[in-house]
Amino acid sequence: MKKTFIFLTMLLIWIETSFAQTNPAITAWIQNHDGTTGRHYVANNPTPIDDGILANVQSVDYSDNWVYVSATGIPSYITGPFLDNNPSLATDQQAIYKISLNPTQNTGTATNTTGGNIGVFVNGVSLFDYRDGVRWDNNYNRLCGGPGNPSCSGGPQANRDWNRDAIPAEMGGFDCNKAHPAMGNYHHHQNPSAFDLDLLVVSDVCDTYPADGLYVIDVNEHSPLIGFTYDGFPIYGAYAYKNTDGTGGITRMKSSYSLRNITTRVNGPYVGQVFTIQNGPNAGNQQVMDLGYFREDYEYIDNSEPDYLDEHNGRFAVTPDYPEGVYAYYATVDENHNSAYPYVVGPTFYGNVTGADVNTINENTTNYNSNLSVNEHPENILDLKIYPNPNQDFVAIQSNLLDKKLQLQLVNELGQVVLESEILSGSTLNILETHTLYNGIYFLKVSYEKQQKSYKIIINK
C-alpha cells in the first residue's frame, strides 16, 4: 500500500511537471536568473545608463487554468531615447499578467482591442494595439487627445470616426527597438525587431543609439513565439510555415488589410491635410494626414491564401511550439520588413478576453523555474550573423532570441583571450570594439550552456 501511494504521488508530480514543460504559455517566458538590469539612453548621450531595475520576467506561476507572469516591464535591450520630446522613461511596472491556459474562440460579437495593455511579450514588455489616443474632433476640425492637443469634445470615452495610428504619427518617438513609454509603461505597438534590421530602414535612430529589439527576422526559419494576448492566444514573429499544416516552406505572414482608395474622409480631414500642433513640447510641428494616418483608412479584404491572415491578424496553424496546431497572431511586416497594419492584434480579438494585469495572485499556484527545465533548445541557437567581417573598429554579433546568456570570447592566433562579452537573455545583439586590436585572424568562441561554436573573424585596418 505504501509503495502504491509513493508511486501515485510520483505520477502526479510527473504529470504536473510534464504539463508545465509542454505548455508554451508557461515555458516561453524569459526569466531573469542572473540579475540582468535594464539600461537606457538619453538624448545626445550614446552611452547607456543602468536603470538598476531587473529586466525581463521575475517569476512564472501557474494553476490549472491560469499563468501569472510577474515582470517589471523592462527589457534587457537598451531603451530610448524618445526623440519626439516624450519626457517619460521606461519604469518598473511591478506587473502581474494573468493569462488563460485554456483560451477559447469568441463565437459572438468580436471584442475590440483597447488603448493600453492588450497583451505581453515573452520578456514582460507590454503590447499595445495600433492607437495612440489621438483622434479627429470634427466639431472643431482638429486633432484631440494626447500630448499637446486639446481634450476631445464629449470626453475621452466618446467615439470618434477617425482614430490616429501610432506607427506613422509617432515614428520620431520610437527608439531603435520600435517602442516607447506612456507614463513609464514601455510598450511595443508593432513588430519588436530593431529598425536597422529592416530591409528598408525608415528611422535612423539606431545609428546613434543602437539596440537590438526582441528578435531578429530570419526569412529561412519560423519566427519565434514572442508573446501572448489577453485572450490567451500566442503571438509569433513575422515568418511562419506557408501552409497551416506546417508544409510549404517558410514565408512572410501577410496582413489582409489594405489602404482604401479615398481622397476625402467623411467627418474627418481630407487625405493629405496638414495639421499644426498648437501646444506642448512639439508646438509648431506639422503633420501630414496622408492615407494610413488613421486606422479607418484601412479596409479588410478577405483572402483565401494560407499565408494571409484573418481580420484579427491571425490564423489556426501548426507551429514549432504547437505541433497539433493553435490559433496564433503574427507581427506583420511588409516586403521591406517595415511594420504592416494591424501590426500584431486587431482591431478585434479572436478569443474571449479574460486576461489582465492584476494586483495579486488569489489562488494556489505552482512556480515554474526555467533554470530547472529540461526543454530542448533549437539546433541553430549558435547560428550567428557577424558583420562586418573583415572589420576595422567593431564587429556586430547578432543572435536569435535567447532565454539565457550567450557567452562570447575573442581569441587570437596564440590562443589568448583578448575580449570577453555576452549577449544577454531576452536580447539579440553585442558589438565588440576591435579598434585597439592588431590586424590578423581571430576566433570568436560562442558558448550557450553546454553548446559551443567558433567563428573566424578578420581584423584589417
Model-predicted segments: where are they?
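A short, polar beta-strand/turn micro-motif
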Residues: 69-115, 119-122, 192-244, 342-348, ...
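Bacterial Sec-dependent N-terminal signal peptides
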Residues: 1-22, 374
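Low-complexity, Pro/Thr/Ser/Gly/Ala-rich linker/spacer regions in secreted
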Residues: 365-381
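Solvent-exposed N-terminal domain segments of exported/luminal and surface proteins
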Residues: 21-175
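Extracellular/lumenal glycan-associated surfaces
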Residues: 122-125, 182-195, 322-338
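Extended, compositionally biased non-globular segments
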Residues: 231-233, 238, 242-355
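C-terminal outer-membrane/trafficking sorting elements
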Residues: 19-20, 376-461
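Core of folded catalytic or high-affinity ligand/protein-binding domains
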Residues: 132, 148, 156-209, 230-231, ...
